[in-house]
Regions:
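Charged DNA-binding/catalytic regions of mobile-element recombinases
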Residues: 1-166
């Protein structure tokens, strides 16, 4: 389990089209390193989808007192089970103002990057094709190879390693 680098993380959900039908992607982003620390994909926009992404994030990162988890006001994030899971880990909830996408700009930016660099250049026949491609993009490219201006043009894994030693 990795060390917690930031007291801030954010979650959101986006939609990817395939010839087989839609695929939803829920992510949790570490706002310090821009690492995607949790994600889940599914055919339905449900509380369980967001909860699976959060569970992965909690598995990948230790939580600390005062950790702030930001999301929009979607029913998946306001759901009792989701809020209970945050509370059980001592995580403070923050939610965007109604109708204000700017409040979750970091995750929206990630989704824009994912779609510009990957999704818009593909024609997914099946949801499984999209899932595999998105998994590889996040795990192999985005977290380990993609450079970020916010991080001084480091990639997330490099930035975390360098700042952990400082």
């Amino acid at each position: 389990m990795a060390t917690l680098f930031t007291p801030l993380q954010a979650g959101d959900i986006t939609f990817v089209w395939t010839a087989e039908g839609g695929l939803y992607l829920a992510v949790v982003l570490d706002l310090y390193s821009r690492t995607v620390i949790g994600w889940a994909m599914g055919t339905r926009l449900t509380e369980d989808l967001a909860e699976r992404a959060l569970t992965m994030a909690l598995t990948n990162r230790t939580s600390a007192t005062g950790l702030l988890h930001h999301s929009d006001r979607g029913s998946q994030y306001a759901a009792t089970r989701y809020q209970r899971l945050l509370g059980e880990h001592g995580i403070i909830t923050s939610m965007s103002r109604t109708g204000n996408g700017w409040d979750n700009a970091c995750v929206e930016s990630f989704f824009g990057t994912l779609k510009r660099e990957l999704v818009y250049h593909r024609h997914y026949v099946t949801r499984e094709d999209a899932k595999q491609d998105i998994f590889e993009y996040i795990k192999v490219f985005y977290n380990r190879q993609r450079r970020h201006s916010t991080l001084g043009y480091d990639f997330p894994a490099e930035y975390e390693a360098r700042t952990a030693m400082a």
